[in-house]
Amino acid sequence: PQTTDNWQNTEIEGIDIMLAVDVSTSMLAEDLKPNRLEAAKQVAAEFINGRPNDNIGLTVFAGEAFTQCPLTVDHGVLLNLFNSIKGDIAQRGMIEDGTAIGMGLANAISRLKDSKAKSKVIILLTDGSNNRGDISPLTAAEIAKQFGIRVYTIGVGTNGTAPYPMQTYAGVQYVNVPVEIDEQTLTQIAGTTNGN
């Protein structure tokens, strides 16, 4: 089948925004309902729906990072790709598990660095402490600053313990595991780039 589209050139002075979303297995913890990843996806979807004039893209990361969706004003496509993210992406071996915050930021920076938008922003949604990757989160924040990119950080989860699904020979069992958010690093990342 073929379709034709009538394209219109419109000039919108929007913002270019990359969402950098942690998809590590720790995002399956259920201290937020139904779990951290789904809670983060709900917040991000509301954000996307509230920004109709902005280019928005999506980077996902665990032990490594990749672009799920480049910058686009087609938020329907973006939301479909966003909703397709499943919490077991690292468990299934699609990407290395862990939390490589610096790599997630670096991937998002690479999508924004050449942007001509009046404002360039990364929104980082993560639950944990950096424990993987070749680039530290603070180094990535310095690079973002050099390109005029502001980083806003959102810590997803609580400190303490949380129910976490563990695959066993008998099926999925829930175990309470210690969880924490490295709020100091998230604050430093945002502060370095004049974000929040």
Spell out what each predicted region is.
Residues 61, 100-102, 126, 153, ...:
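Short glycine/serine/threonine-biased micro-segments
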Residues 92-96, 110, 119-121, 128-188, ...:
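VWA/integrin I-like adhesion module and closely mimicked acidic/polar interface patches used
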Residues 23, 127-128:
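Residues immediately flanking
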Residues 56, 149, 195:
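Short, conserved active-site loop motifs that form the nucleotide-linked donor/cofactor pocket
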Residues 18, 59, 123, 152-154:
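Hydrophobic/aromatic beta-strand patches that form the interior of the parallel beta-sheet core
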Residues 16, 189-196:
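Juxtamembrane amphipathic/hinge helix adjacent to a transmembrane helix
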Residues 3-118, 135:
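Membrane-embedded segments
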